[in-house]
Amino acid sequence: MRFKLIFFLFTLFSFNSYLCQENDNLILNPSFESIDGKLRKLNQINVANDWYSPTSLKADLFSSSVPGDIGTPENIYGKEFPKEGENYAGILTYSYNNKKPRTYLQSMLIKPLASGLNYCLNIHVSLSDLSKYAIDNIGIHFSEEPVTLDKKGDIIFNDKAKLSAVVTNEKNKIYKSRYKWETVCGVYQADGKEKYITIGNFFNNKDTEYEKLTKSDDFPGIQSPNAYYYIDNVELIL
């Protein structure tokens, strides 16, 4: 009888732990798998449920269900298999001499962050094959209200208050891996009431470290003077 009770309690504890692990992530649609509408072209991140872009130039959504420019694993920017599922997003984080505007991802959290608690952030990124540059400074910004810019352009934070709400990798390394996902990992201590996240590069070009890369022989095409990254499997947990 005692053995059965212990076994029951162990099973219950394991099940509850499993449920907690499944529900820990505060990011809605973290792998961009849930979509609503027809994905037809670039700049359609809004087809992914719960995701959009804060500027007038929209981020991209790629899917194995759509061949060509917006497919996976091959698309207009390179080749990469999804980290999880069938889809991933893509953003431009750097352009040499600011020739092209950046793009960003934004979403509302499942619930507001609690004051004083530390949250662990993980974003998986992969540099596209046709990017001539790789950069650091890929991060996530937390805010109570959505960040907006009613035109094409870069969202640059110059004041300390906004920069303190940007989380990058602790070592803030340059992300230059192609054909392999790297993790942007950081910890954010919440002020409380943060409801939104925005993903991208919030630093100007002179404060962004970059590395110029030779073209990969594994994918045809001409390099562009940009740093374009695929994004997948976004996670924010206590």
Q: For the regions a protein language model found, what residue spans apply to each?
A:
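Aromatic (Trp/Tyr/Phe) and Gly/Pro-enriched flexible surface segments
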Residues: 21-108, 112-114, 138, 152-238
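Solvent-exposed strand-to-loop "edge" motifs in beta-rich extracellular domains
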Residues: 110, 124-130, 189
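A short tyrosine-centered beta-strand micro-motif
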Residues: 118-123
